Regions:
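Double-stranded beta-helix
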Residues: 105-125
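Short, conserved beta-strand element in jelly-roll/cupin
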Residues: 46-50, 61-79, 117-121
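Short beta-strand His + acidic residue motifs that chelate non-heme Fe in jelly-roll/DSBH
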Residues: 57, 77-78, 94, 101-107
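Short, charged/polar surface micro-motifs in flexible loops or helix N-caps
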Residues: 50-54, 74, 83, 98, ...
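Conserved short histidine dyad/triad with adjacent acidic residue
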Residues: 27-30, 45-61, 99
Length: 125
């Protein structure tokens, strides 16, 4: 497949969470790189979190592995172990069915950009 034209890659802004759970994730912005490249086995997203925005509600996946790499800015990773600051160059992995809920929160004053990679196993959101 040739180089992706980022202007043609699908973008998803906001969330599918119902109120009031949608509020902290409302301004997240996902450039769906995997979809733009026709990938079917795993998803790849370029996620931008503005200050105060969450990546998601805290969650874990039964069937899907998930990986995040911080490209720029700073976020706070929240898991069962507590809170951990992450900056550009840091990464985290979330194996399927580990039961440790996670999410990322941008508590800084600048945008944060992350690369998300995850299995597409269906029926596991």
């Amino acid at each position: 497949m040739p180089k992706l034209d980022l202007a043609k890659v699908p973008v998803r802004t906001g969330t599918r969470y119902p109120p009031p759970y949608d509020v902290p994730c409302r301004d997240r912005h996902r450039l769906q790189l995997g979809d733009g490249g026709g990938l079917s086995q795993f998803g790849v997203n370029l996620l931008t979190l503005k200050p105060g925005v969450w990546s998601s509600q805290r969650h874990w996946h039964r069937k899907e592995d998930e990986f995040v790499y911080i490209l720029s800015g700073e976020v706070v990773l929240i898991t069962d172990a507590g809170e951990e600051a992450m900056k550009a160059g840091d990464c985290a992995a979330f194996p399927a069915n580990d039961g440790n809920g996670h999410h990322l929160v941008n508590r800084s004053n600048a945008d944060a950009m992350l690369l998300e990679v995850g299995t597409r196993s269906g029926g596991d959101s």
